[in-house]
Amino acid sequence: MDSDYQHILIAADFSSHSDEVCSKARQLAERNHARLSICHIVEDFPLTDFAYEPMISVDIDMRDALLEAGKKQLTKLADSMGIAHNQQWVECGSPGHDIVRIADEQQVDLIVVGSHGRHGIKMLLGSTANAVLHHAHCDVLAVRLRDD
C-alpha cells in the first residue's frame, strides 16, 4: 500500500467510525513521513423554494449552524492529531465533489475515506466514498467500517 505518499487527506464525517479512518491515515502518514490534512464537507441542501421565502433564512441559519459545529468538531479532532490549522477545511457543498476538489487544490496524493458495507456498489462504499473513488486524480483508500 505504501507508495511514498507525501500529502494525505482525511475525509472526516464525524460518524462513530471516524477514529478508524483517522488512525489508518495517521499510520500511513507516519510510515511515509507525509503531511496530513483533514476536511469535512457539510452536505449542501437546496434552499426552500422562493414561494416559501420566510423559510430561506431558516435554511441559511441552519447551514451556518452546521458549518460552525463542523468547524468546532474538526478543529478538536485535527488538534488532537497535530494537524496544522492551515491544513483543515470545513465547507458546505457536495462531499464527493468537494473532497476531490480540495485534494486537487492541495496536491494531495492519497485520500483516506470511510466506507460502509450496505448494498450495491454505493452501499458497499457509501455514496461519498464512491464519488471520491471514481473522480479523484490521486490514490484513494476506502477504510472498511464495521456496522454496529
Predicted regions and their residues:
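Structural beta-alpha unit
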Residues: 1-4, 76-111, 148
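Small/aliphatic-rich secondary-structure junction motif
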Residues: 2-56
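General small-molecule cofactor/ligand-binding pocket signal
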Residues: 39, 87-91, 141
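Short, hinge-like loop/turn segments at secondary-structure boundaries
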Residues: 53-57, 105-106, 129-130
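A short acidic, glycine-rich active-site loop
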Residues: 56-70
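Glycine-rich, Arg-bearing micro-motifs that act as flexible, cationic patches
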Residues: 110-131
